[in-house]
């Protein structure tokens, strides 16, 4: 009888502990939603305003005028090199405030709020998948010694990510002797069965399987053949750990996050990555003479 009583008490204690943990998680999620909601409402209101074409053209035009003048860079053949961060264009026929867009915005803001990665902190060693053979690996498997590792999260249906891929590829070509680069293909930013935009260069539905994700990644790989590419898992473990949706840049060195770029589209700046790499290159090899 005593043994049965102790067993019953132990079972009750386990249930009570489980209930307490669930309650704490629920309270934490509720508190985070209360913190995120004002930010989400502000973004939703801005998207609603941008659906008025006169406001959209005024705000986007003012943003372009407010950007600093870009110094023209020439390649070895004397041809002008496109800018690192071409302005984000939004076609007039795109609606920005829809149920699909609000879901995507909430998803991105929630991932950013709960992310494990923070500049100056340890880099999450989240799981990724090789496109060939679907072998599971981890992000830090691609870090070699003290060499910086650049992480570039994105997808084919994200217009800013694709528009800046050529600039990213130029940095890969220029700095790959001292720096490693890794593209992580994540869930689609603008899937054809979700938040659709006519500015997306490709029409790709949401990934239902790793086979879907690798098919989309193959398209991207054609434009970045010199850079290693892996897939995020179907549970989006890397995108969640790094708050990378819609797109994002990171630099890891010796297991520490040395640079955390802003969340796309506005915070995704290849020019910031270039500045960091230039400074790192100067530390290694001294300042390079500027071409006149």
Swiss-Prot record:
GO terms for biological process: hormone biosynthetic process; thyroid hormone catabolic process. The keyword Cell inner membrane does not apply. One of its GO terms (molecular function) is thyroxine 5-deiodinase activity. This is Thyroxine 5-deiodinase. Plays a crucial role in the metabolism of thyroid hormones (TH) and has specific roles in TH activation and inactivation by deiodination.Catalyzes the deiodination of L-thyroxine (T4) to 3,3',5'-triiodothyronine (rT3), 3,5,3'-triiodothyronine (T3) to 3,3'-diiodothyronine (3,3'-T2), 3,5-diiodothyronine (3,5-T2) to 3-monoiodothyronine (3-T1), rT3 to 3',5'-diiodothyronine (3',5'-T2) and 3,3'-T2 to 3'-monoiodothyronine (3'-T1) via inner-ring deiodination (IRD). Catalyzes the deiodination of 3-T1 to L-thyronine (T0) via outer-ring deiodination (ORD). Its main location: membrane. It catalyses: 3,3',5'-triiodo-L-thyronine + iodide + A + H(+) = L-thyroxine + AH2; 3,3'-diiodo-L-thyronine + iodide + A + H(+) = 3,3',5-triiodo-L-thyronine + AH2; 3-iodo-L-thyronine + iodide + A + H(+) = 3,5-diiodo-L-thyronine + AH2; L-thyronine + iodide + A + H(+) = 3-iodo-L-thyronine + AH2. Its EC number is 1.21.99.3. It is found in: Cell membrane; Endosome membrane. The keyword Transmembrane applies. Gene3D superfamilies: Glutaredoxin. Residues 1-30 are cytoplasmic. The chain crosses the membrane at residues 31-50. The active site is at residue 158. The gene is DIO3. It is an enzyme of class 1 (oxidoreductase). Keywords: Cell membrane, Endosome, Membrane, Oxidoreductase, Selenocysteine, Signal-anchor, Thyroid hormones biosynthesis, Transmembrane, Transmembrane helix. GO terms for cellular component: endosome membrane; plasma membrane. Belongs to the iodothyronine deiodinase family. It comes from the Eukaryota. Pfam families: T4_deiodinase. Monomer. Homodimer. May undergo minor heretodimerization with DIO1 and DIO2.
